[in-house]
């Protein structure tokens, strides 16, 4: 009996050690084992490999290139808002829909700090007000940096250049075009996710579509005040090109060349998916490229300045294509007080002691301020971050080192989405998917 009791005590102690021992990402051995087991089961079932178009393993092969994984089943329709602007409405199988808005922010260069502070305040207010918007379940902002083929600048200059311009002016223009070769471009989108049932669209989605269309002018005006620049509602054709170039980066240059030649690109939504995609445990291969996805496990701590993410968001010559998506989800007003109170009590417990650290004192002050603002009527918003880097297989590890360094410079703690690279890739696209409502309905 004593031997069995001693053995049981040892097993309990070992089990407690396994559960309580966590790494810097707060992941224990059980969590890591679960990641590998779940991924292994999906791989054995063939769920980690996707083939589209004529290569699709279906009874009737087709030329359709549907989206893989958790994006299967999403549909796109086009509506017109109150300002007569066409926009794409992305409908997901879980009765949610999303609108994608293209922004043109000017950046922080040559902008005084007072203006930056005002824009940050407006952005915070815009995000906070989403909790008061009926039917909005979440929002996201996506910042993508990628090589610029140069066609956009060439088209803009050519269309504005006078035929009889002076020789000196012509040489300056040609110099600008030459210098743009090999440069980068930055694209920004904001995506709004809606609950169609809350907008009266469970049975009739046209009603929900018209309701969304009537509210877009006010929502986009708030983005302009927050420094978003001119706003543009993304159309179906533009959204299809956006998704297609994410899965097949080489198509970006083909689209640019077609536009430079004055051709019209007619890419339908069923043609926006990849021909081939394969999810590995720590990477995602798709149409000749490979991506790695990270998720944020700890946000910047302490005082957070407006430029804290600048190193991560700006283009980097060592990362061919980088996409950073911040997901926002308004918290239920009935749940917010208890969450704030719990955080405040936790901060107080950490600050109690003979010699509390400076960090714990600052965290207590921040928690107290949040509690005061929430009591005054401010809304709370949960947020997460997904980072996607796309490159060639030979440069994947070097790119990963650079992304980790950029994240550390931005005071972020990130971890690869082990066993969920394909889902992380889809969540990082500006299509309105959020982790709490994303699910796989079917596979082709």
Predicted regions, residues:
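Extended, folded cores of ATP/NTP-driven motor/assembly subunits in large transport
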Residues: 4-444
């Amino acid at each position: 009996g004593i031997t069995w009791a001693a053995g049981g005590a040892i097993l309990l102690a070992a089990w407690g050690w396994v559960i309580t021992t966590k790494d810097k990402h707060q992941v224990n051995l059980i969590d890591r084992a679960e990641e590998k087991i779940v991924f292994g089961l999906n791989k054995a079932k063939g769920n980690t490999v996707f083939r589209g178009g004529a290569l699709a393993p279906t009874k009737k092969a087709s030329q359709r290139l549907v989206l893989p994984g958790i994006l299967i089943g999403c549909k796109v329709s086009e509506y017109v808002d109150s300002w007569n602007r066409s926009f794409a409405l992305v409908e997901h199988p879980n009765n949610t829909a999303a609108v994608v808005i293209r922004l043109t922010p000017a950046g922080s260069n040559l902008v005084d700090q007072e203006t930056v502070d005002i824009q940050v305040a407006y952005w915070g207010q815009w995000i906070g007000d989403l909790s008061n918007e009926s039917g909005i379940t979440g929002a996201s902002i996506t910042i993508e940096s990628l090589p610029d083929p140069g066609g956009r600048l060439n088209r803009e200059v050519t269309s504005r250049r006078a035929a009889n311009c002076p020789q000196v002016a012509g040489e300056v223009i040609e110099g600008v075009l030459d210098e743009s070769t090999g440069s980068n471009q930055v694209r920004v989108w904001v995506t709004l996710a809606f609950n169609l049932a809350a907008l009266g669209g469970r049975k009739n989605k046209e009603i929900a579509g018209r309701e969304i269309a009537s509210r877009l002018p006010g929502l986009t005006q708030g983005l302009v005040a927050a420094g978003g620049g001119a706003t543009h509602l993304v159309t179906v054709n533009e959204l299809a090109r956006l998704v297609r170039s994410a899965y097949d980066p080489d198509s970006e240059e083909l689209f640019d060349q077609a536009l430079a030649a004055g051709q019209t690109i007619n890419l339908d939504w069923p043609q926006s998916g990849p021909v081939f995609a394969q999810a590995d445990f720590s990477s995602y291969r798709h149409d000749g490229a490979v991506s790695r996805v990270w998720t944020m496990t700890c946000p910047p701590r302490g005082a957070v300045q407006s430029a804290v993410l600048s190193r991560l968001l700006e283009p980097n010559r060592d990362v061919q294509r980088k996409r950073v998506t911040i997901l926002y989800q308004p918290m239920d007003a009935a749940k917010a007080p208890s969450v704030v109170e719990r955080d405040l009590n936790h901060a107080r417990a950490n600050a109690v002691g003979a010699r509390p650290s400076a960090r714990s004192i600052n965290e207590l002050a921040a928690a107290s301020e949040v509690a005061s603002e929430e009591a005054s009527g401010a809304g709370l918003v949960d947020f997460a971050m997904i980072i996607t880097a796309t490159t060639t297989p030979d440069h994947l590890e070097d790119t990963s080192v650079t992304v980790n360094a950029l994240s550390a410079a931005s005071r972020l703690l990130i971890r690869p989405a082990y066993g969920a690279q394909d889902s992380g890739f889809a969540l990082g696209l500006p299509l309105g998917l959020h982790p709490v409502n994303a699910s796989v309905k079917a596979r082709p």
